[in-house]
Design a protein with these regions (language model features):
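Polytopic transmembrane helical bundles with strong interfacial aromatic enrichment
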Residues: 1-143
């Protein structure tokens, strides 16, 4: 029961993250002007990351109860990555973006580095989520 709940949360997390990439982001940039898209993204990203943190933490707990070690380790790594994105990277990205808009030359390089780190963490989390499925189902079918 616990392992099934963890796998279900893993699927939910992958769905939430994928829908943001496939639906939300492209829609924002196609329908909103720069000012409104900036405001929307600054509002949505912390909430997205916190929601994903909640799901991944619950996933970790269910994997812990099921004694699925791989899921536990990966689940906690994913949870930590969302905390890093929410409380470390996002505020700095926003600050560098604001400085860029005022003409601060050095801030563009820093913005790109921080944004790249944020996207990389997000995509690595998705890879880790898929790896949980692979490990779980390969164990299941090898029994």
């Amino acid at each position: 029961m616990f392992i099934g709940s963890g796998i279900l949360l893993n699927a939910l997390l992958l769905g939430v993250m994928t829908s943001f990439i496939v639906v939300t982001s492209p829609t924002v940039f196609k329908t909103l002007d720069e000012e409104h898209s900036k405001n929307f993204l600054r509002f949505i990203f912390p909430r997205l990351f916190n929601f994903c943190f909640l799901i991944s933490t619950l996933m970790f707990l269910f994997f812990a109860l099921a004694e699925f070690s791989f899921g536990m380790v990966v689940g906690i790594a994913i949870s930590i990555s969302f905390l890093i994105n929410t409380y470390f990277l996002t505020p700095r990205i926003n600050k560098m973006r604001d400085l860029m808009l005022t003409g601060h030359v050095e801030s563009e390089k820093q913005f790109k580095k921080l944004h790249f780190a944020s996207v990389l963490l997000y995509l690595l989390s998705m890879v880790f989520i898929v790896s949980i499925f692979i490990v779980y189902y390969s164990r299941l079918f090898s029994l």
